[in-house]
Amino acid sequence: MAATPVRTRFAPSPTGYLHIGGARTALFSWAYARRHGGRFILRIEDTDVARSTPEAVQAILDGMKWLGLEHDEGPFYQMQRMDRYKEVIQQMLAAGTAYYCYTSKEELDALRAEQEAKKEKPRYDGRWRPAPGKTLPTPPAGVQPVVRFCNPTTGVVAWDDLVKGRIEISNTELDDFIIARADGTPTYNFCVVVDDWDMGITQVIRGDDHVNNTPRQINVLQALGASVPQYAHLSMILGDDGTKLSKRHGAVSVMQYDDEGYLPEAVINYLARLGWSHGDDEIFSREQFVEWFDLDHITPSAAQFNTEKLNWLNAHYIKQADNAYLAAEVANRLARRGVDPEAGPALEQVVALYKDRSANLNELADAAELFCVDVHAAPEVIAQHLTDTARAALASLRARFEAVAWDKAALNQAIKDTMAEHGLKMPQVAIPLRVALLGVPQTPSIDAVVEVLGRERVLARLARHLG
């Protein structure tokens, strides 16, 4: 008998941005489907009408696209499936696996207070649940009932969690939860079940904040005669300080990492190592990750987010990246700043100079901007470095630059000849030259900077300071 094709899903609620925890869930679900030749489904759980927004949906789609987590089916929207949910609820009412409940809020509040006074766990008491020989109250006039699920009253719900191991919950711990509100709208736990059933989901990979939902969802699936998927609940992500990851730990939105100059390849690599490992391997490609990924090596303990490690990874990926790719990314960032990317030398040349000393794309763009815009150094920097002695040396050097062959070796010799003429050491010429050309005292090798900047720009910028 052929194995059931793998079908995983990512099902975010569009009430905000795509955060790091959600991105990791999406990555693991996507990788599992790719590893097993399966299908990855994107589902938007937008039943919280008050908080769901089109902007949040777009932010999720943008984040997925930036990370390169392409879905095979979807996105499916729960609000577009309401008729299907209501159809299944009617089937359950007819089958006796669900029932109408007319208990008012006041009655539920009184029941809760009574149970709490007795130190009992608050739960619905089943007063409207049909049973053989039981006479139900007369439905009150003008009251719209909710629909509750007939949760089993005996036995246990058990599943072998692919991360946490065997989990068993006694059905006596669960009550008859609401699957449709009084206005007829189905609840989250019910919609999820119908979606997973209809979409043939085989593995549900999600955060462990959903563990408590799982026994209820399994019971509904079994009541529907549906196949129960395997579940894998991922541990939470903690911040650098060991507390739950939040805004105070820095960027939490995936697209914020784009804004801050991280490469998607670096973020993917880092997310992959948040709770999963393959021996001591720290750096690997997306393709290698898919080949290696399994659920057996996901740790059940909380993962800790380490910004320094992410920064280290990002710097590594920038060093290894193709110069043309980096130049295109830098050009986009310059354009967003209002800087013409074509106002300076070829960005690929600038990128080649600076990629080994840049931790992110924004640092690369900062450097490139100095080549595109004639930057004026701060007055105190000019006062410190462009002394009369330095200006005299730069005037001699400018004259040499007018005639010299424009290659690194010849430019280096021109600088050395100027040093000899004025009795100066390399820093006494190179630092003022950096300040005059780029407005900063520190750059890569000065002869390389001069070569890339080009004769016309070098002469013009020197003339401005010597005028």
Swiss-Prot record:
<feature type="short sequence motif" description="'KMSKS' region">
    <location>
        <begin position="244"/>
        <end position="248"/>
    </location>
</feature>
<dbReference type="InterPro" id="IPR020058">
    <property type="entry name" value="Glu/Gln-tRNA-synth_Ib_cat-dom"/>
</dbReference>
<keyword id="KW-0963">Cytoplasm</keyword>
<keyword id="KW-0648">Protein biosynthesis</keyword>
<keyword id="KW-0030">Aminoacyl-tRNA synthetase</keyword>
<keyword id="KW-0547">Nucleotide-binding</keyword>
<dbReference type="GO" id="GO:0005524">
    <property type="term" value="F:ATP binding"/>
</dbReference>
<dbReference type="InterPro" id="IPR004527">
    <property type="entry name" value="Glu-tRNA-ligase_bac/mito"/>
</dbReference>
<dbReference type="InterPro" id="IPR045462">
    <property type="entry name" value="aa-tRNA-synth_I_cd-bd"/>
</dbReference>
<dbReference type="InterPro" id="IPR014729">
    <property type="entry name" value="Rossmann-like_a/b/a_fold"/>
</dbReference>
<dbReference type="Pfam" id="PF19269">
    <property type="entry name" value="Anticodon_2"/>
</dbReference>
<dbReference type="Pfam" id="PF00749">
    <property type="entry name" value="tRNA-synt_1c"/>
</dbReference>
<dbReference type="InterPro" id="IPR008925">
    <property type="entry name" value="aa_tRNA-synth_I_cd-bd_sf"/>
</dbReference>
<comment type="similarity">
    <text>Belongs to the class-I aminoacyl-tRNA synthetase family. Glutamate--tRNA ligase type 1 subfamily.</text>
</comment>
<comment type="subunit">
    <text>Monomer.</text>
</comment>
<comment type="function">
    <text>Catalyzes the attachment of glutamate to tRNA(Glu) in a two-step reaction: glutamate is first activated by ATP to form Glu-AMP and then transferred to the acceptor end of tRNA(Glu).</text>
</comment>
<protein>
    <recommendedName>
        <fullName>Glutamate--tRNA ligase</fullName>
        <ecNumber>6.1.1.17</ecNumber>
    </recommendedName>
</protein>
<feature type="binding site">
    <location>
        <position position="247"/>
    </location>
    <ligand>
        <name>ATP</name>
    </ligand>
</feature>
<keyword id="KW-0067">ATP-binding</keyword>
<dbReference type="InterPro" id="IPR000924">
    <property type="entry name" value="Glu/Gln-tRNA-synth"/>
</dbReference>
<dbReference type="InterPro" id="IPR001412">
    <property type="entry name" value="aa-tRNA-synth_I_CS"/>
</dbReference>
<feature type="short sequence motif" description="'HIGH' region">
    <location>
        <begin position="12"/>
        <end position="22"/>
    </location>
</feature>
<dbReference type="GO" id="GO:0006424">
    <property type="term" value="P:glutamyl-tRNA aminoacylation"/>
</dbReference>
<dbReference type="InterPro" id="IPR033910">
    <property type="entry name" value="GluRS_core"/>
</dbReference>
<feature type="compositionally biased region" description="Basic and acidic residues">
    <location>
        <begin position="114"/>
        <end position="128"/>
    </location>
</feature>
<dbReference type="GO" id="GO:0005829">
    <property type="term" value="C:cytosol"/>
</dbReference>
<dbReference type="GO" id="GO:0008270">
    <property type="term" value="F:zinc ion binding"/>
</dbReference>
<dbReference type="GO" id="GO:0004818">
    <property type="term" value="F:glutamate-tRNA ligase activity"/>
</dbReference>
<keyword id="KW-0436">Ligase</keyword>
<feature type="region of interest" description="Disordered">
    <location>
        <begin position="114"/>
        <end position="140"/>
    </location>
</feature>
<dbReference type="InterPro" id="IPR049940">
    <property type="entry name" value="GluQ/Sye"/>
</dbReference>
<dbReference type="InterPro" id="IPR020751">
    <property type="entry name" value="aa-tRNA-synth_I_codon-bd_sub2"/>
</dbReference>
<dbReference type="GO" id="GO:0000049">
    <property type="term" value="F:tRNA binding"/>
</dbReference>
